[in-house]
Amino acid sequence: MKQTAAVLLARRPGRTFVADDVTVGTVDLPALTPGHALVRNQYMSLDPSTRGRMDPGEKQYTTNFEVGGPLDGSAIGVVVESAADSLPVGATVRHRLGWREYAVIDEAVVTVCDLDTAPATAWLSSLGQTGFTAYAGLLPVGQLAAGETVLVSGAGGAVGSMAGQFARLLGAGRVVGSAGGAQKCAWLVEDCGFDHAINYRDSDFATELPKAAPGDIDLFFDNVGGWQFASALHSMKIHGRVSMCGAVSNFGTQDQPSTAVLIEAVLRRLTIRGFIVRDFEDLRPQFERQVGGWLATGALVDRATIVEGIENAGAGLAGLLSGANLGKALVKLSD
């Protein structure tokens, strides 16, 4: 049986993930059967949700990784051998068997990517699950309306940078982001069109937010949770909305705020809604048309931080979780 190099979970991480929590090993490649194709992966996505799946607790929307078993996630690759009519050799495809150099994929759960619409990396970022998450969190979840003030936490990362740009392109009146570091904040304002960016590492977020959004916030797109979430509730408008996309602060060492802050949700009559993007698949064609159009006209900045080689995937994930990336975090596996 053929095998491929793959990233395996070496142990359950502590509160802070380190690169040695994973290791590179091999996994078997199943035989090619009708409806399947062998893909050489070119790029794979690094996502905060990967860290959550390393814990043993049950998740309601996906499966958790087993110690000694391979990781998986979104990837882009080229078909090198095929027993599927819809997947000719040479086609570029997006699928869910990343974290390995080769994969046998089922044509029923694969997206064939049009490289005339966007480059391969964009199909993992602005046109991938990253962009789709931002789009869903703003529209069906967040109910964004023209002229509103939007706050995005974790705005220097993949989903956050897309959420802020999408909000601007969809007609938001003011877009404020939070990010860790002066470089990220400058990029958000100068390149991505944010009106203001708060450097939470060098300033007090709770003090700076009312200055950045003096009329208070209509919609808060939260990727971070923790103290930023708690502080933002004090700057929400009456009947404001919160789209809860993630809580990456849970994976760090910082103490978490008391749930007593949720009284602000009562006093301000807030709508706080968590979401999983796969619940909105019926929206994907609209999303791809609209975002593809923005890419074609140059209205959208799609930046990636790329780590080279499967052996560096663990370090890349550790960097992502510590906020080292600017925009989308990817691993390049092959040309």
Question: What is the predicted role of each segment?
Answer:
Residues 189, 227-300, 334-335:
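Glycine-rich phosphate-binding loop and adjacent beta-alpha segment
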Residues 94, 151, 198, 220-221:
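N-terminal Rossmann-like NAD(P) cofactor-binding module of classical short-chain dehydrogenase/reductase
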Residues 123-202:
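Mid-domain Rossmann-like dinucleotide-binding core that forms the NAD(H)/NADP(H) cofactor-binding site
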Residues 1-2, 278-335:
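C-terminal hydrophobic helical "lid"/dimerization subdomain
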Residues 71-78, 88-154:
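NAD(P)H dinucleotide-binding glycine-rich loop of Rossmann-like/cofactor-binding domains
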Residues 204-215:
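Short amphipathic alpha-helix with an adjacent loop that forms part of the alpha/beta core around
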Residues 82-86, 177-187, 201, 205, ...:
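Short glycine/proline-centered loop/turn elements that form peptide/ligand docking sites
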